[in-house]
């Protein structure tokens, strides 16, 4: 569908969050001519990439009254995609000649380098002038009394503690999904005497010195943290429900790190029994089981819900048909190259709001969503995987690009993504520091020369 030639309309738009999604959303909205206010509860840009030593007092992060820490970054974290692949399309993630030499030049850099990149992006495009820092959004709800499509936002500034009530034409939700942890269900856990925690509260390995630790999960964090802890722990065991029931493998290169099938049960004597029949005495169980989508501020009278981590109904993972185009989300899909996708989603939202890009009718959007849900059900795919994309992300990106009238994802970026996945599976210990895709890097830098 080609962009229409309708007159451009400007709207007053609120963006919730100043992480990687919120920053590019703000830029694209302003480029399209909209008036933008970004709400950010922290004192700087960067969202989930802001590292802090602080952890929550509740190691499982289940206490609703807890003081929430808005970062899940651990000290040793490095990207699992190369920087060339990660960056926004017109602001390459390259070593910049005009910044400090203390920056991390590696292709798979630290979390600090990603944060610095986002700060550079915000500075380059003067985004901070649109941001209200230290401001928490406590309520987003339709403001029917103000006219169709209007939204009421209530927010509080950290120091003032005064509720601010404002009306906006549209809201773009960019608050991320790495704050509210998911947990595995473990038979017998209520009487197990050891320590339970979620990886949200992991920072450094030292607290686990000489301990026996079980991690649950097969995510990038489980992989990274298990190897991190193995440097100091007595034993590390990784349990994963996707592993065959008889799985028991010593991790190559380690004498104290094993892969298992899922936990079968835990007991009062401190033991953990795996589906493979192995029983060990354990000090700590760490849930590396991901996060829930969480929008505690959003009131939609049931029109947008989170059901087993399916956010919906959403058209193309972005627009709520009930409120389109006045309520949208950036950054819902996972297992993707995030920043370039955020950029395309933001361009689409900005163009739709201005009237330049048409949306289908509410009925047609709902029909497509119902068809998607039926297809997933027929394939036996659980609701919690609704937003997992993987290989399908590039078809999705192509569709977004066609709506926006911009170029599709570069071939080198696609190839780099797939090559990195192959390398990671074959060489999980070394893929970040040994690579053979120099021809793709060369192609990337040819493209980057247009912007740097």
From Swiss-Prot:
NADP(+) binds at residues 217-222. FAD binds at residues 17-22. Its EC number is 1.8.-.-. Its cofactor is FAD. Keywords: FAD, Flavoprotein, Monooxygenase, NADP, Oxidoreductase. Pfam families: FMO-like. One of its GO terms (molecular function) is NADP binding. Signal peptide: none annotated. GO terms for cellular component: plant-type vacuole. Catalyzes the conversion of methylthioalkyl glucosinolates of any chain length into methylsulfinylalkyl glucosinolates. Belongs to the FMO family. This is Flavin-containing monooxygenase FMO GS-OX-like 4.
């Amino acid at each position: 569908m080609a962009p229409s030639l309708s007159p451009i309309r400007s709207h007053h738009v609120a963006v919730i969050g100043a992480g990687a999604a919120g920053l590019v959303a703000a830029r694209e909205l302003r480029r399209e001519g909209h008036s933008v206010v970004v709400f950010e509860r922290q004192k700087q840009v960067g969202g989930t990439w802001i590292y802090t030593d602080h952890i929550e007092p509740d190691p499982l992060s289940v206490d609703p009254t807890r003081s929430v820490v808005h970062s899940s970054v651990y000290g040793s974290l490095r990207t699992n995609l190369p920087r060339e692949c990660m960056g926004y399309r017109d602001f390459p993630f390259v070593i910049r000649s005009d910044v400090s030499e203390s920056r991390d030049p590696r292709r798979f850099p630290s979390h600090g380098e990603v944060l610095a990149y986002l700060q550079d992006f915000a500075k380059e495009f003067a985004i901070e002038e649109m941001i209200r820092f230290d401001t928490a959004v406590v309520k987003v709800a339709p403001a029917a009394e103000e006219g169709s499509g209007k939204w009421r936002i209530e927010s509080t500034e950290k120091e003032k503690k005064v509720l601010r009530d404002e009306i906006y034409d549209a809201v773009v939700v960019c608050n991320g999904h790495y704050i509210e942890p998911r947990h595995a269900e473990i038979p017998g856990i209520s009487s197990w005497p050891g320590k339970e925690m979620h990886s949200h509260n992991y920072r450094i390995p030292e607290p686990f010195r000489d301990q026996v630790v079980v991690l649950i999960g097969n995510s990038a964090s489980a992989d990274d943290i298990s190897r991190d802890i193995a440097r100091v722990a007595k034993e590390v065991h990784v349990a994963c429900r996707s592993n065959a029931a008889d799985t028991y493998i010593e991790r190559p290169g380690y004498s104290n790190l094993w892969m298992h099938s899922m936990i079968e049960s835990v007991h009062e004597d401190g033991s953990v029994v795996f589906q493979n029949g192995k029983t060990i005495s354990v000090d700590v169980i760490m849930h590396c089981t991901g996060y829930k989508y969480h929008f505690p501020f959003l009131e939609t009278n049931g029109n947008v819900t989170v059901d087993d981590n399916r956010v919906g109904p959403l058209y193309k993972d972005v627009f709520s048909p009930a409120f389109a185009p006045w309520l949208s989300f950036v950054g819902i899909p996972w297992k993707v190259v995030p920043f370039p996708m955020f950029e395309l989603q933001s361009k689409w939202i900005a163009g739709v709001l201005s009237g330049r890009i048409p949306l289908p009718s509410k009925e047609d959007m709902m029909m497509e969503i119902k068809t998607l849900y039926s297809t997933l059900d027929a394939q036996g795919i659980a609701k919690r995987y609704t937003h997992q994309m993987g290989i399908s992300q590039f078809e999705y990106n192509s569709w977004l690009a066609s709506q926006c009238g911009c170029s599709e994802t570069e071939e080198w970026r696609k190839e780099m993504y797939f090559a990195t996945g192959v390398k990671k599976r074959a060489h999980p210990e070394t893929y970040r520091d040994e690579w053979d895709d120099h021809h793709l890097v060369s192609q990337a830098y040819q493209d980057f020369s247009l912007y740097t």
